[in-house]
Amino acid sequence: MQITLMKGKIHRASVTEADLHYEGSISIDRTLLEAAGMVINERVEIYNVETGTRFATYVIEAPPMSGTMSLNGAAARLVMPGDKIIIVAYASFDEAEAKKFKPHVVRVDRDNRILAS
């Protein structure tokens, strides 16, 4: 049996941009991607803390240490710059792996700088 667990999370990041006319995705600072164990093109769930909206998209890389957290394409209609969001990636594990697995949780400040991971 496979069990789906949270693999990585970036907690309470601040949206820096919402670009309706860019190809759909979320651009995330590479430093945050690496700390959360996320990879380019990975499917992620986005939870908007301000509105309660939840949606899925995929990851593209933004420059490291830029603090970028940009929702692009149709997803740009679901956020506003300054909104707090939670970005979560999931993975499937067999039961034995699931019992041992520890997710990467990255907490950030209002400028999307790592506070703790």
Swiss-Prot record:
The active site is at 25 (schiff-base intermediate with substrate), 58 (proton donor). Keywords: Autocatalytic cleavage, Cytoplasm, Decarboxylase, Lyase, Pantothenate biosynthesis, Pyruvate, Schiff base, Zymogen. Substrate binds at residues 57, 73-75. Its EC number is 4.1.1.11. It is found in: Cytoplasm. GO terms for biological process: alanine biosynthetic process; pantothenate biosynthetic process. It catalyses: L-aspartate + H(+) = beta-alanine + CO2. Its cofactor is pyruvate. One of its GO terms (cellular component) is cytosol. Binds 1 pyruvoyl group covalently per subunit. One of its GO terms (molecular function) is aspartate 1-decarboxylase activity. Is synthesized initially as an inactive proenzyme, which is activated by self-cleavage at a specific serine bond to produce a beta-subunit with a hydroxyl group at its C-terminus and an alpha-subunit with a pyruvoyl group at its N-terminus. The modification Pyruvic acid (Ser) is found at residue 25. Pathway: Cofactor biosynthesis; (R)-pantothenate biosynthesis; beta-alanine from L-aspartate: step 1/1. Belongs to the PanD family. Heterooctamer of four alpha and four beta subunits. Catalyzes the pyruvoyl-dependent decarboxylation of aspartate to produce beta-alanine. This is Aspartate 1-decarboxylase. It comes from Bradyrhizobium diazoefficiens (strain JCM 10833 / BCRC 13528 / IAM 13628 / NBRC 14792 / USDA 110).
